[in-house]
Regions:
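Divalent metal-dependent phosphoesterase catalytic cores across multiple superfamilies
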Residues: 724-805, 867-885
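Gly/Ser/Thr/Pro-rich low-complexity, intrinsically disordered segments
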Residues: 22-566, 572
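Secreted extracellular polysaccharide-interacting domains
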Residues: 610-635, 657-665
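Short carbohydrate-recognition loop motifs
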Residues: 594-618
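Extracellular carbohydrate-recognition regions
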Residues: 561-588, 720-740
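His/acidic metal-ligating clusters that form di-metal
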Residues: 776-777, 826-902
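Binuclear metal-dependent phosphoesterase catalytic core
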Residues: 381-393, 897-943
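Extracellular beta-strand ligand-recognition surfaces/modules
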Residues: 636-638, 676-717, 721
């Protein structure tokens, strides 16, 4: 291909890592995006994770010195009708806009509280000499003068009526008719054609008609008149009619002087202003909090805010919104000032906030504007006016192209489709006909059909899109075949005689997920009543089955449950039970109970007393009728009503061959009230089976305790007991770092072992068990990391670190270990400062090859705040892209290990001694072996 033109540019997708150097400690992380919506106007969105939660900040950065930019007020045609900001932007042709002035929520037909000026003309406003609003309430006005200089001051305004340049009197307002008219009102044709509607409400008014600066008519009382296009009328209350009619006879040259003034005595004509929009109090002056009087609504509350601000030493202003929803925390005045200082603000003032806060802008390359923020209450409020941003330029010729792929990762034979957007030299959108776009390859191999690329060889492909002589390029990474397959969902529930759809992804060498074409996947099923074609599942009668997807020699399984996933087996409405029997230290009883009840009309209550003993104390219930467990069950569920007694709860399961299993429902009844608990059924149990007993026990009792526990609504969850790759992810199966076993290190190699809980409330380990576990964990290991707060006193040689639900970091050779507390549901909720400390440590880790982060929860699946978990993941992905480091997130929990690979980040769960059978030997740990820059791992049993 011939050499490409200078206009060819590759699209680079960026993810903001955050402003680590921020002086505001409350900001933990930032996700920032920017796009130019027209030359001179940039939309910035910044999602800030603070110690209070997330803040969603939208900023319209406007360069007033750019000749392409116009700022104008927006309102409805009548000035009284309320509209949402999106409608105002659409109707006025603006490219963006925010809400502006306050208004009377209790009235449906009233103007804004402040003045409104456009192009040197007062559209409407109250005379400050007679109004109780405006400067008398410390409510400021945002102005831009004819030299494009912005200001935010407590502007007063007066409206004077003059005859032959001699003052006759002052008008109470312009283009506003108050409920009671006590002074003259000036009305022009901006909003009214006649005075008929006004006279109908105020029948005693007199009217002077002024056209081309001359009085042309004096009306009778209550007479309606037309308002001249080149003039105005003066409505006069009956008490002042004689005075004004005498002073302003027909033929008199009349002028209306509209002047702004400040308390400093400075005055200027309205004609000197391009724009003026009222708002609330001044927020900042000279980069600091304003210390004078200022009207502010709920300054101490975290609410939605709209602000206009100027930027230090620049021609820029900012239109800023901060949202308040269930997902975003809003902001108070003190923190708002701190936020604005981040953006180098000089002066700032409030616009209306709360439910009125709205930010609308078109996206880059798009003609239609759209809502960009999340209004309080879930939908836009209709407001009285706004500030609109306009492009002064007409749509020009195409100058820039943006190419958007369905994916930047692909496999040979898979399709990638593209769309393009265009803008002119002023970054205004230019519509593009897809038929006018041609696609070609600057490097790599493949062929196009329209906008769809089919790569034919692995490697990097540089795609070039050309339209009207403008080119843009984008690189696509193509691999021959996936390293593994991922089916979503991995466990599918489907109703009988219905269909559902799988999505299958190929995992490439980077760990990225690439969607695969359904027609290229071969499916098989181990159940004749379940079939899959082109990723669509069809199911007939109730059953469970496994389906296998095959693609280019790679395969993966998914589970299908046809019919209900959870089935009630005994709600204990008729099944009775008896106490298991007293001992020297344990006494109790079992009875039916009608309160509390979770389901139906009764539950079973077991009351028991544990007396002090160093031996295990056990209380149990024997069901009169054993509870049947179906062949397709994978877990047994029950609702328990606890009293925070802290005892372990188990059930006894007897399989069809008579073998007994003791399955743990909960390690500790550390809850009060009803809670859903569940026990997985071991793979080796032969079903069908039956539940015969319910147990609670304590391994050690220091003080006598009498308590009770209630049982209700026993159910099963249908599925697969061997859940590897189905109930739990097993991405290690295609991970090149994973080995089935690891030899002990030699030479400069070293090993790090990481284990979950080594202590369990349900399990009393003797010294032999602890010694055996210590030996297993310590064998060949330079470092042992205990990734749980539940630990036995292990006898370990060498270096050991213990997760303590607080921030810690250690470096061993070329591996950095970072422990972050997450026990309260996430990093922020547990120890907010750990965010900045972890980021600072990670970004100063150029001397290590491996970063291992230990926490108690998987950020992507277990954080209470899913956005926080995703943000942490995205941050790690960006670090990996920049540095190429190996990054692992290891967390403790579950009854079995799990490995997830997400965009090159490995999330590994270690269950420690926790296992379905409650035998520590069935537990496991993660063994890592470092060999120079290479790292390998395996999952090893504790036995």
């Amino acid at each position: 291909m011939k050499k490409m033109s200078k206009k060819l540019a590759a699209i680079v997708l960026l993810m903001g890592i955050g402003w680590i150097s921020s002086i505001h400690a409350s900001i933990l992380h930032s996700i920032k995006s920017e796009e130019i919506i027209t030359k001179g106007a940039t939309h910035i969105n910044e999602k800030l994770l603070t110690d209070k939660g997330w803040r969603n900040v939208n900023i319209l950065k406007i360069d007033l010195a750019d000749s392409n930019i116009l700022l104008k007020p927006m309102e409805s045609a009548t000035g009284l009708e309320r509209q949402n900001i999106l409608q105002m932007v659409q109707d006025s042709g603006a490219v963006a806009g925010v809400n502006a002035d306050y208004f009377d929520m209790g009235s449906s037909n009233s103007p804004s509280l402040g003045m409104l000026i456009e192009d040197g003309k007062l559209l409407h406003g109250y005379n400050s000499n007679f109004s109780s609003l405006g400067i008398k309430k410390n409510m400021a006005t945002f102005m831009i003068d004819q030299s494009n200089l912005p200001s935010m001051e407590y502007y007063g305004i007066n409206v004077q009526i003059k005859a032959n340049d001699v003052l006759v009197g002052e008008a109470e307002a312009k283009n506003i008719v108050p409920t009671s008219v006590k002074r003259p009102i000036v009305l022009d044709s901006t909003y009214y054609e006649t005075t008929s509607d006004i006279i109908a409400k105020h029948p005693t008014l007199y009217t002077l008609v002024v056209e081309n600066g001359e009085v042309t008519y004096q009306s009778y009382s209550g007479e309606s008149v037309s308002i001249p296009k080149e003039g105005y009328v003066i409505l006069i209350p009956e008490a002042d009619a004689n005075l004004y009619y005498a002073a302003l006879p027909i033929g008199t040259i009349v002028s209306i002087d509209e002047n702004l003034y400040l308390n400093s005595g400075l005055t200027t004509a309205v004609a000197n202003m391009k724009l003026g929009v009222g708002g609330s109090g001044i927020l900042m002056k000279n980069g600091e909090a304003y210390t004078g009087d200022a009207h502010a609504v709920t300054p101490k509350a975290d609410v939605a805010r709209t602000v206009v601000a100027s930027v230090k030493e620049s021609n820029e202003i900012l239109l800023v919104t901060v949202d308040k929803t269930s997902d975003y925390v809003g902001i108070n005045q003190t923190e708002l000032i701190e936020l604005l200082q981040r953006y180098n603000v000089q002066d700032a003032m409030y616009f209306d906030g709360g439910g009125s806060t709205t930010f609308v802008a078109r996206n880059e390359g798009e003609l239609a504007p759209s809502l960009q923020n999340y209004p309080t209450g879930g939908e836009q409020r209709k407001v009285i006016n706004g500030v609109g941003v306009y492009s002064a330029s007409q749509m020009g010729n195409l100058a820039n192209l943006k190419i958007i792929p369905t994916s930047t990762e692909a496999f040979v034979g898979e399709k990638v489709s593209f769309t393009v957007k265009g803008t002119d030299e002023n970054n205004n959108p230019v519509p593009i006909d897809s038929n006018d776009v041609t696609y070609s390859l600057a490097s790599g191999e493949g062929h196009f059909s329209g906008n769809i690329l089919s790569p034919t060889k692995a490697g990097n492909i540089l795609v070039v899109a050309t339209c009207q002589g403008v080119e843009v390029g984008l690189e696509i990474n193509v691999e021959e075949a996936p390293k593994g397959l991922q089916i979503e969902p991995s466990l599918l529930q489907i109703d009988e005689n219905s269909t559902k759809t799988f999505q299958v992804y190929g995992i490439n060498s980077k760990g990225s997920k690439v969607p695969l074409s359904g027609d290229k996947i071969t499916w098989t099923s181990n159940q004749s009543s379940i079939s899959v074609s082109n990723n669509t599942v069809s199911a007939q009668g109730e059953c469970i089955g496994k389906v296998t997807a095959q693609y280019k020699g790679i395969q993966s399984e998914a589970g299908v449950v046809v019919g209900k996933a959870t089935i009630a087996v005994d709600s204990l409405e008729t099944n009775s039970a008896k106490w298991g029997g007293d001992t020297n230290t344990v006494t109790g009883s079992v009875c039916a109970c009608d309160d509390p009840v979770y389901h139906g009309s009764r539950s079973l209550k077991m009351t028991y007393t544990f007396n002090p003993s160093s031996n295990k104390q056990v209380a149990y219930t024997v069901f009169d009728t054993p509870i049947p467990i179906r062949e397709d069950a994978r877990s047994i569920n029950m609702w328990l009503y606890g009293k925070e007694q802290g005892h372990t709860a188990k059930i006894e399961l007897v399989d069809s061959e008579g073998k007994t299993y003791y399955l743990k429902l909960t390690d500790s009844i550390n809850f009060s009230g009803w809670k859903f608990v569940s026990a997985s059924i071991p793979d080796e149990a032969v079903l069908p089976a039956k539940v015969t007993k319910f147990y609670t026990y304590a391994n050690l009792v220091n003080e006598k305790i009498t308590t009770s526990v209630y049982m209700d609504h026993i159910s099963i969850t249908r599925g697969f007991r061997n859940g590897i790759g189905i109930a739990t992810r097993a991405d290690y199966l295609f991970d090149p770092y994973y080995k089935e076993s690891l030899q002990l290190p030699t030479g400069n190699q070293y090993m790090i072992n990481i284990v979950g809980a080594t202590r369990s409330d349900s399990m009393l380990l003797n010294s032999e068990s602890i010694d055996a576990m210590s030996k297993k964990l310590g064998e060949g290991a330079s470092v042992v990391v205990k990734a749980s707060t539940k630990n036995s006193q292990l006898s370990l040689n060498g270096t050991q670190y213990t997760y303590a639900n607080t921030y810690q970091e250690e470096t061993y050779k070329n591996t950095k270990l970072i422990m972050i507390g997450t026990d309260s549901g996430g990093i922020r909720a547990t120890e907010a400062s750990a965010w900045s400390r972890a980021k600072a440590s990670i970004e100063n880790s150029s001397n290590v090859k491996n970063i291992m982060i230990v926490m108690s929860l998987n950020p992507l699946t277990q954080f209470s705040d899913a956005k926080e978990g995703k943000a942490f993941h995205d941050y790690l992905v960006e670090i990996k892209k920049q540095t190429g480091q190996n990054i692992f997130v290891i967390y403790a929990g579950g009854k079995e290990p799990e490995v997830r690979m997400e965009e090159g980040i490995r999330y590994i769960r270690t269950n420690g001694i926790d296992a379905t059978t409650d035998s520590y030997q069935e537990g496991s740990f993660i063994k890592f072996k470092m060999d120079s820059d290479a790292v390998y791992y395996t999952i090893e049993k504790l036995k």
